[in-house]
């Protein structure tokens, strides 16, 4: 019984990474850009219907909703070879097409105006599923549409579908270069409040780290957006392989999430992937064994979140799930886990078991791969809080000077006062505090003393 997942793509970033994700899924399942199953795709052991459904003429259509407040990216998708893949009724562009101007408040208040049209699309998709498991939201947190409209939709999804899971792939801004969005810290903080309160699981895609990996590991001098987005689509497709090539465990979203998130608020995950290769570097193929892959996944340089060195806090893993793709002998997995535990390659929380789970998954039979084994690590690690601390520091600088707030004042939510900003700041601070508390043995009783 497949549990379907509806993908919501928001704004420029969300639609670009979503586009790469669907390209990747089509390649893995042997589906042509028009949605027709290729003649060579005869192995019927994959589950296409988690992410696709079939039209009357047998071609596959993604369960995706494409939303944007300005037309550029969606038009480029509609002019690509994949234009016929999507259901045109599932594409929503706002009528005036002016975008949200990288302003969270603008994206949020436009969400209030257009949410009925958007939910007509989402409800229709949900009604077309046999047993909908949840939603996956792709967006960035720094701009206007992905952050503002994304925040609004997260709140509404919780009201409308309280029992469905909401997982997000959230792109965090690149800290190494100057941003062209001056209000980025405001946008990020306001979105983080919703990600904390309204999502069940947030996969953090940190542009700072993705750029670093592209330059250091893939040796690309100035990585373009499309190269970074390919990295992202690799993560997204690898994190859903167990849903699409079902094994005996982790073959639905709740199974993936349950093993990684023991306490509800600490649901921000980081990812690592190995071995990374681009088309040019196939020459550097090594022999990959399960132990190699699992050991490399624990190396900080393969982790796609740039967390600073925090000497005061003893950061540790809350839980790890490694999704290993390829030809793997299960006894090897057991040995590798023992080796990792013996050598203490990973530092775990003091208040619970050292949870490293391994899900084995097949590779797509239709994609040539240079490696026998590749792996994706999804980890819940307390050092993710340093990302939120960085956002808070930047926010505090701007807020102290009340910089750029007049852009927000124009919208209803900030007409009277800026309480929404201040409560968001408090909620993100509580999240940071809880991550710090999770590094200590007394975390189990944390939050009970204060009341």
Curated annotation (Swiss-Prot):
It comes from the Eukaryota. Its main location: cytoplasm. InterPro entries: Gamma_tubulin, Tub_FtsZ_C, Tubulin, Tubulin/FtsZ-like_C, Tubulin/FtsZ_2-layer-sand-dom, Tubulin/FtsZ_GTPase_sf, Tubulin_C, Tubulin_CS. GTP binds at residues 142-148. Phosphorylation at Ser-131 by BRSK1 regulates centrosome duplication, possibly by mediating relocation of gamma-tubulin and its associated proteins from the cytoplasm to the centrosome. One of its GO terms (molecular function) is GTP binding. GO terms for biological process: cytoplasmic microtubule organization; meiotic spindle organization; microtubule nucleation; mitotic cell cycle; mitotic sister chromatid segregation; mitotic spindle organization. Pfam families: Tubulin, Tubulin_C. SUPFAM superfamilies: Tubulin C-terminal domain-like (SSF55307), Tubulin nucleotide-binding domain-like (SSF52490). This is Tubulin gamma-1 chain. It is found in: Cytoplasm, Cytoskeleton, Microtubule organizing center, Centrosome; Cytoplasm, Cytoskeleton, Spindle. Belongs to the tubulin family. Keywords: Cytoplasm, Cytoskeleton, GTP-binding, Microtubule, Nucleotide-binding, Phosphoprotein. The lineage of its organism: Eukaryota, Metazoa, Chordata, Craniata, Vertebrata. The modification Phosphoserine is found at residue 131. PANTHER family: TUBULIN. Tubulin is the major constituent of microtubules, protein filaments consisting of alpha- and beta-tubulin heterodimers. Gamma-tubulin is a key component of the gamma-tubulin ring complex (gTuRC) which mediates microtubule nucleation. The gTuRC regulates the minus-end nucleation of alpha-beta tubulin heterodimers that grow into microtubule protafilaments, a critical step in centrosome duplication and spindle formation.
């Amino acid at each position: 019984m497949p549990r379907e997942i509806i993908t919501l793509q928001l704004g420029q970033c969300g639609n670009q990474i979503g586009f790469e994700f669907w390209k990747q899924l089509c390649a893995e399942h042997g589906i042509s850009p028009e949605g027709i199953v290729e003649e060579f795709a005869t192995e019927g052991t994959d589950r296409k219907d988690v992410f696709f459904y079939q039209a009357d003429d047998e071609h596959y259509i993604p369960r995706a909703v494409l939303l944007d407040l300005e037309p550029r990216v969606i038009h480029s998708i509609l002019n690509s070879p994949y234009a016929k893949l999507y259901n045109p009724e599932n594409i929503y562009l706002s009528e005036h097409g002016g975008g949200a101007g990288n302003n969270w408040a603008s994206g949020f208040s436009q969400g209030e105006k257009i949410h009925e049209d958007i939910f007509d699309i989402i409800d229709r998709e949900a009604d077309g599923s046999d047993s909908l498991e949840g939603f996956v939201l792709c967006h960035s947190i720094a701009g206007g549409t992905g952050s503002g409209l994304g925040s609004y939709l997260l709140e509404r999804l919780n009201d409308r579908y309280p029992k469905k899971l909401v997982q997000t792939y959230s792109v965090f801004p690149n800290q190494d270069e100057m941003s062209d969005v001056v209000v980025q810290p405001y946008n990020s903080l306001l979105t983080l409040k919703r990600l904390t309160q309204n999502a069940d699981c947030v996969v953090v895609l940190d542009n700072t780290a993705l750029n670093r990996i592209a330059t250091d590991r893939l040796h690309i001098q100035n990585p373009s957006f499309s190269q970074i987005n390919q990295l992202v689509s690799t993560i997204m497709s690898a994190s859903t392989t167990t849903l699409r090539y079902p094994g005996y465990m982790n073959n639905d979203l709740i199974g993936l999430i349950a093993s990684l998130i023991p306490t509800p608020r600490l649901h921000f995950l980081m990812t690592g992937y190995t071995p990374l290769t681009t088309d040019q570097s196939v020459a550097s193929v090594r022999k990959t064994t399960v132990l190699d892959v699992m050991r490399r996944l624990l190396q900080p340089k393969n982790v796609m979140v740039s967390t600073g060195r925090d000497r005061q806090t003893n950061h540790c893993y809350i839980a790890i799930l490694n999704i290993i793709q390829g030809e793997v002998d299960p006894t090897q997995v057991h040995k590798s886990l023992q080796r990792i535990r013996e050598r203490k390659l990973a530092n775990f929380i003091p208040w619970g078991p050292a949870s490293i789970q391994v899900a084995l998954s097949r590779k797509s039979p239709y994609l040539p791969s240079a490696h026998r084994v590749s792996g994706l690590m999804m980890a819940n690690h307390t050092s993710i809080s340093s990302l939120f601390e960085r956002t808070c520091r930047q926010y505090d600088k701007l807020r102290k000077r009340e910089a750029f707030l007049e852009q927000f004042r124009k919208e209803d939510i900030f007409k009277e006062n800026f309480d929404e900003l201040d409560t968001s700041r408090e909620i993100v601070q509580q999240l940071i505090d809880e991550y710090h508390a999770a590094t200590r043995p007394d975390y189990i009783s944390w939050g009970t003393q204060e009341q």
